[in-house]
Amino acid sequence: MGRLGYWTLLVLPALLVWRDPAQNAAAEKGPPALNIAVLLGHSHDVTERELRNLWGPEQATGLPLDVNVVALLMNRTDPKSLITHVCDLMSGARIHGLVFGDDTDQEAVAQMLDFISSQTFIPILGIHGGASMIMADKDPTSTFFQFGASIQQQATVMLKIMQDYDWHVFSLVTTIFPGYRDFISFIKTTVDNSFVGWDMQNVITLDTSFEDAKTQVQLKKIHSSVILLYCSKDEAVLILSEARSLGLTGYDFFWIVPSLVSGNTELIPKEFPSGLISVSYDDWDYSLEARVRDGLGILTTAASSMLEKFSYIPEAKASCYGQAEKPETPLHTLHQFMVNVTWDGKDLSFTEEGYQVHPRLVVIVLNKDREWEKVGKWENQTLSLRHAVWPRYKSFSDCEPDDNHLSIVTLEEAPFVIVEDIDPLTETCVRNTVPCRKFVKINNSTNEGMNVKKCCKGFCIDILKKLSRTVKFTYDLYLVTNGKHGKKVNNVWNGMIGEVVYQRAVMAVGSLTINEERSEVVDFSVPFVETGISVMVSRSNGTVSPSAFLEPFSASVWVMMFVMLLIVSAIAVFVFEYFSPVGYNRNLAKGKAPHGPSFTIGKAIWLLWGLVFNNSVPVQNPKGTTSKIMVSVWAFFAVIFLASYTANLAAFMIQEEFVDQVTGLSDKKFQRPHDYSPPFRFGTVPNGSTERNIRNNYPYMHQYMTRFNQRGVEDALVSLKTGKLDAFIYDAAVLNYKAGRDEGCKLVTIGSGYIFASTGYGIALQKGSPWKRQIDLALLQFVGDGEMEELETLWLTGICHNEKNEVMSSQLDIDNMAGVFYMLAAAMALSLITFIWEHLFYWKLRFCFTGVCSDRPGLLFSISRGIYSCIHGVHIEEKKKSPDFNLTGSQSNMLKLLRSAKNISNMSNMNSSRMDSPKRATDFIQRGSLIVDMVSDKGNLIYSDNRSFQGKDSIFGDNMNELQTFVANRHKDNLSNYVFQGQHPLTLNESNPNTVEVAVSTESKGNSRPRQLWKKSMESLRQDSLNQNPVSQRDEKTAENRTHSLKSPRYLPEEVAHSDISETSSRATCHREPDNNKNHKTKDNFKRSMASKYPKDCSDVDRTYMKTKASSPRDKIYTIDGEKEPSFHLDPPQFVENITLPENVGFPDTYQDHNENFRKGDSTLPMNRNPLHNEDGLPNNDQYKLYAKHFTLKDKGSPHSEGSDRYRQNSTHCRSCLSNLPTYSGHFTMRSPFKCDACLRMGNLYDIDEDQMLQETGNPATREEVYQQDWSQNNALQFQKNKLRINRQHSYDNILDKPREIDLSRPSRSISLKDRERLLEGNLYGSLFSVPSSKLLGNKSSLFPQGLEDSKRSKSLLPDHASDNPFLHTYGDDQRLVIGRCPSDPYKHSLPSQAVNDSYLRSSLRSTASYCSRDSRGHSDVYISEHVMPYAANKNTMYSTPRVLNSCSNRRVYKKMPSIESDV
């Protein structure tokens, strides 16, 4: 150091200490001062001012210290000069810390600084040169920190370099330089505890103080290509020179040294060979200025932390001069706060040994230009290297290059080259893979990146390994950086071809297609794989058509099934059953039950439909043999049809996968993609042979597909599956592999891998390469030995190719069954429309169809009548004016029917029946026109004292809804045979049989009009009336009385509990209140008659009649009684408005004859018919003439003589016109079932009862056939000849029909045998079926030539009264519980206990008075037994006339006339 430098050191302390007194005072009050010295070697291009300016106000912001930087440059850095400068600086400036950097590569500098620090306790930072070099065995009390890495950290990086390049075999060479033991120990420990397959062959420790001969002997032990060297830089020169003489430097040897050997990178000894690898502290990216700044930051940060914690900074030693004393270690030093320091966002922490925790190390190599080159970086425990393949350097000019080690480039493309990550545990490549390096970009803008170690395998990798063993070469494998095969762009080749052309690689191995353009710049080997261009498409899930469930059969088959076969077969079954002699009552055969179950076309279609689909639906099976055969054949057809449908259904319900069909590159989809909607989308990977081929041969196609090109094969596969691409054009070998290994096998190649522009894959070598011939011979050998075929089977065959014939089943989704759900939805919509139309028709439109709107016969009636006329050939005379369809019109028609009768029976000796009348018959004035007034709805009845009959006040409101409620709640009223308004028992005028007198009240009750099909021709009625009696003018109705009281004249409400659903229309009638009855009232006249003079069972009317009989010209009375309901309906009476419930309830006694032997001696008279009354045939007893209905078989106590006296009259009457039929011997207790000739002729005009077509062809029953069996108690249980047997058929007779008792020539068709047996078991009425018909006639001989046509009158099998019927529940049952027990109940309940022969001969008739009492009182029930009564009228016509229903009768008749209209 010169004189100037010496004087500077003497004056500097004085300058630092001297201050102005004011400044000293301020300093005492200000923050504590921190003095830091910076000493650098003079060789650095930096001045002291620049060093002081490195710490400015911006760095001191936020610090509680006043930092003073003292900068000093030194010319010499030898140990003596270094100690002198530091001691002088400490004596003058009292520094707290020192930042030291030199430009030497001598580790002695670090040792001197460590000594000073341990003596003065001043923290010293060695930031550069020898001060930062590795130092072993530091003083424990030292506070010396270095910007460098420890021996262990550098050894770790050296092993990482060998691991990345797979240099697992190595040798270790060291000297006795301090720290070598630590280095050897760490290497051995790491190798022994690592999963990497390290092989440390030799550990050689040299002593350079001996002769060179011994060094050479030890170096000759090295047989590995990788050598780790730990020594000083001077020792390394000696060792490397000896290694060169031994041939241990060159292409195949890699020397790796720590930073001790490299030292100062600017000083490179000539003995260092090219390719020498060193791990050094980063001098390239970490400048000296940055290191100084970081050193200052570390010291100030540690001082601030100490000040914050202890509120003081330790004072430094004033001088290092003086007598040596034993140093005392302070309790708290700055060293403790320098271990964990973070400055300027960087972790600058130090270890306990004084080295950085995260040093910035780099890998440098001595290149061929003899310069250190940075090739890698260690940062954050990660090593990144520049070269994918470590470059082979020519160490010296006299070294020969090694041509057997090749650099090979490849391209990732499965299955030829598959790239995988290294094993995370061993950090190496597993078996059957080779190491390969892949370049990964870190910064896309600067293309900066790093090579990452990967593992490669695949078809081409296996070929490469075979070639390496056969041809004898080694290689380094790396992946092409741009991921392309090779294309010439701007006269520059890229991809694998570019690597070979520009000699960065010796050869290129992979899926490289041989073509003419590439062959011009590189040499190709023989093809090892045949390939070309192919097209890959994706299978798309096909949609299932909504009509898929119909596709198992063609449209013609469905038409034949549902239109032809079903309809035709149903019609055939119906026709066979219609005309079958043993079928249902649909063929109008003679003798069949007129209202039995019918077999319609609808039932036939329903039966066949149920058979087709095996539905468990209730059907009605035919009974005819022919129709059964037809149904059986249809059932066999249904089995075949359904089985065939089920077998083919699965094939049409699955989703068929759709694949685009492409024939080749010339396909229209490729050449004219815009012709499709949407346009056909296809593409390829650019810069390949496929794109070049398309560009050269199909320019338009190439121009179109550029927008759909893909970056790689994997991206193309994803685009195919997601629908972004319709077709992918690429190498056939790759596409076949991808199709075979695709998950789900959704990707397929067209034509099962059809190839266009066939070519092959080859290995590209540099032009004129000496390896070409050897590689060609090896490849041909592989093909000949079958090794190539084995590799193809291993890598190129996929699992999808083996599963082409496998059937894959899947669950049916909603798309598969969509058509069936659509059909159900359509059916529900159609049902809703039908439901709305049904209600619209019922409430709005049906009146016009039934003729209410036009006051003419309705359309349905006309169609039904026309069908009947066509089938039976009956001429129906058109009327000029249709009958009135209101209530008055119905009564007028019945009046004309009564007037058209030839004779009216003159009945006398009317018995006082159970007519609960509040008024006597004598109170009324006899008027011949009473019927006309009643029918005309005038209500002009008067008493004998000229008082008007007062109507009752209505107990119900005038609201029509109440009436509709009553109609809806009615239970047992049969509106088809309802009574007239104010109706009461008929009293026939005895003196004048042509006049009718009826006791009628003015109470207006709504009655139903008869069915239109039962109406008689107005012309015929008029003609008959003219022949018998002129038509009275009273039956001409006024216009105001022609009102429509019913909504429909065709359908009449039936009994809800009894009616048949198929034939009943429950419609409410409109009640009409007469004008003259609004304010009339009547008195409650319930009386109990005194039965002293007259019979006890006579009512008031009967007794009144008997009293006045002597002065009356009447001779006969015809009354009809039916069963009565118990008194007082809790539910309002139907069709009654003016009703007053009596306060005192009385139940009339029931007259019954308890003598079972009465009249058993009577005989049957010959059959005759007299239009007039047969007075001779009448009994002499006037008391009970023709009105003995109160006496039944229960009257066992009556004497025979009394019964003979009371029931001695032997004539019957016409049930319609009431004319007498006296020639028949029999006493009738109720209305006759027979008609006269006139009524028979009139009844045939509009009546379309099917029974009219039945001719009585049965043979007359002989006496033996009829009376051949003897019954027990024959005389007591004989049928009384005066007991008329009238059978009443309930609506449930259609369910259980009565067998034919009389006509044995025709079988019964009531029910099927199976149902009959089920119903007969344990049935109270089951005995009816088993009684012989011959027993029904007793022992009397038949007097009729045609047999007993009793089957025309069916008797209900079930009890007639609700109390005896276990299946019905009436409102009367509830009434009895509320009001009390009816006096007639004992008789009603005792009836079923009679004899067996009597149980099935009993019928219940509702008395006329039960519904027609003047005060609408409650009714009582009577039970009478009837004779089995044959018809007495001569059957001189073709048709037998059914019973005419008229409104004057109160008999409950549930039998409904059949209608073809209901079946149509």
UniProtKB/Swiss-Prot annotation:
GO cellular component entries: cell surface; cytoplasm; cytoplasmic vesicle membrane; dendrite membrane; dendritic spine; endoplasmic reticulum; endoplasmic reticulum membrane; glutamatergic synapse
Residues noted as binding Zn(2+) in the record, renumbered to the chain: H44, H128, E266, D282
Motif placement: PDZ-binding: 1462-1464
Intramembrane stretches (start-end): 601-615
Protein origin, superkingdom: Eukaryota
Entry GO MF terms: ATPase binding; calcium channel activity; calcium-dependent protein binding; cell adhesion molecule binding; glutamate binding; glutamate receptor binding; glutamate-gated calcium ion channel activity; glutamate-gated receptor activity
Documented effect of changing N264W: Nearly abolishes inhibition by Zn(2+)
Consequence of substituting D282 to A/H: Nearly abolishes inhibition by Zn(2+)
UniProt region (Pore-forming), positions on chain: 599-620
Assembly, per entry: Heterotetramer. Forms heterotetrameric channels composed of two GluN1/zeta subunits (GRIN1), and two identical GluN2/epsilon subunits (GRIN2A, GRIN2B, GRIN2C or GRIN2D) or GluN3 subunits (GRIN3A or GRIN3B) (in vitro). Can also form heterotetrameric channels that contain at least two GluN1 subunits and at least two different GluN2 subunits (or a combination of one GluN2 and one GluN3 subunits) (in vitro). In vivo, the subunit composition may depend on the expression levels of the different subunits. Found in a complex with GRIN1, GRIN3A and PPP2CB. Found in a complex with GRIN1 and GRIN3B.
Reported function: Component of N-methyl-D-aspartate (NMDA) receptors (NMDARs) that function as heterotetrameric, ligand-gated cation channels with high calcium permeability and voltage-dependent block by Mg(2+). NMDARs participate in synaptic plasticity for learning and memory formation by contributing to the slow phase of excitatory postsynaptic current, long-term synaptic potentiation, and learning.
Name of this chain's protein: Glutamate receptor ionotropic, NMDA 2A
Protein source organism: Rattus norvegicus (Rat)
